[in-house]
């Protein structure tokens, strides 16, 4: 036990005091203790207590309660719009589905409750006046930057297969390594991830990929991750001899995720880019050939990768915007970019500035995970030049019908009949403007429309 002081939110402190004043023991527990000790701001404050669900309901009957977890001992109370989960100390029964206990047994012992938790860094509790309760070495593992299972790792993963991905997510989120015994048990149990619902797999993978240390975690634990995404296994050890690459396909993909610069991207853009980069070369093992010079070639891996990424993302039940956004980027991630204004304007017309900014971010990350050669540096300079000019033209150029100095009503006013011909004429005018053969000026456009 440590006498360190953790500053609790007023509402969490109030809940603890109410439970304790009624004769129950109660502590904040889990991630909020871990994050507080790391100097991070906890997102949630969970409470464990000797109080049974009926006792909690009676104590907080004047508050709004959520009772969906009551059979497992959890009562959530809503204070100032924020839920606080309070859970009775418990022992878990067997886990026949590798996800949920078949039954739970309520107990009065905090130590028994902490023993059932996943990792030592999540198995600490705290109460004012008592300090941090750390029975399984969580603090030393925080100091050593290690994710370690409580007790026997194989048992923890047999109880709940999703803990395998949780271990990787914590590795990526915190920049921690897996304890060797924990990593070995996770690898041995990776196939049990097939028993976990697609939605839960997606949520954990998404959290991993969006974490700051995702690249390093992917590089270290690809074989474990293949239990959730089997398609990555052929990428591990798939070599890329030649002047462009210094990594195999998997290590390259991991390095690209780590190299992503997400500044300026909105929430959806961040997610789309993380997943697109993760899967951008997923089909390379299927397309690999070796030329007479010994260099590896991957003809068609863009399109085939887009198809395979769509299968993976749909299987994981990813949101539609993510599926379409990531697949669209993968399909063209290795395609050359135009250097001339006409080509850039036409690309803006087809794809839009948001897509092209995402594409540049993916291309930068992809190239930064290549070999450090003059050829790669030249390609990166080409992307930078394209991005600069594209951003300029996105602000000042004309590449959509709405940006034309005339509209359909203007064309009908000069005698063009209503119908498909109006749209066709506008498209012709837009093409001429993008080609640079016609200025985007009202009189010039109207004159061209009647020719």
Predicted segments, located by residue:
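Catalytic cores of the polymerase beta-like nucleotidyltransferase superfamily
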Residues: 1-451
């Amino acid at each position: 036990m440590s006498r360190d002081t953790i500053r609790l939110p007023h509402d969490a402190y109030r809940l603890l005091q109410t439970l304790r004043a009624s004769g129950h023991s109660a502590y904040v527990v889990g991630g909020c203790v871990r994050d507080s000790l790391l100097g991070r701001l906890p997102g949630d404050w969970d409470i464990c207590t000797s109080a049974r669900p009926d006792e909690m309901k009676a104590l907080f009957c004047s508050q709004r309660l959520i009772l969906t977890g009551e059979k497992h001992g959890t009562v959530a109370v809503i204070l100032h719009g924020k839920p606080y989960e309070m859970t009775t100390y418990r022992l878990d029964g067997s886990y026949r589905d590798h996800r949920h206990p078949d039954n739970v047994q309520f107990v009065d012992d905090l130590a028994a409750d902490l023993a059932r938790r996943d990792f030592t860094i999540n198995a600490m509790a705290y109460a004012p006046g008592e300090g941090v309760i750390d029975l399984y070495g969580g603090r030393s593992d925080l100091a050593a930057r290690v994710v370690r299972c409580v007790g026997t790792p194989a048992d923890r993963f047999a109880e709940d297969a999703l803990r395998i991905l949780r271990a990787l997510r914590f590795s990526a989120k915190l920049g921690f390594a897996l304890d060797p015994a924990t990593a070995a048990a996770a690898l041995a149990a990776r196939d049990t991830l097939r028993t976990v619902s697609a939605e839960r797999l997606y949520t954990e993978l998404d959290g991993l990929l969006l974490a700051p240390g995702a690249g390093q975690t992917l590089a270290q634990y690809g074989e474990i991750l293949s239990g959730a995404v089997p398609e990555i296994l052929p990428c591990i050890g798939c070599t890329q001899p030649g002047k462009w690459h210094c990594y195999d396909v998997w290590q390259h993909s991991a390095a690209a995720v780590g190299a992503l610069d997400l500044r300026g991207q909105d929430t959806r853009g961040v997610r789309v880019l993380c997943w697109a980069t993760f899967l951008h070369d997923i089909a390379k093992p299927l397309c690999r050939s070796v030329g007479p010079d010994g260099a590896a070639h991957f003809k068609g891996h863009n399109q085939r990768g887009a198809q395979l990424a769509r299968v993976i993302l749909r299987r994981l039940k990813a949101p539609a915007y993510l599926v379409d956004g990531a697949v669209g980027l993968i399909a063209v991630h290795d395609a050359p970019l135009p250097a001339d204004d006409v080509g850039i304007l036409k690309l803006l017309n087809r794809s839009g500035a948001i897509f092209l900014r995402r594409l540049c971010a993916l291309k930068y990350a992809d190239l930064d995970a290549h070999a450090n050669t003059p050829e790669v540096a030249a390609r990166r300079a080409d992307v930078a030049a394209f991005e600069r000019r594209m951003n300029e033209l996105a602000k000042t150029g004309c590449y959509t019908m709405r940006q034309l100095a005339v509209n359909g009503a203007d064309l009908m006013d000069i005698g063009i009949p209503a119908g498909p011909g109006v749209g066709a004429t506008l498209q012709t005018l837009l093409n001429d403007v993008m080609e640079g053969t016609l200025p985007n000026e009202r009189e010039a456009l109207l004159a061209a429309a009647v020719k």
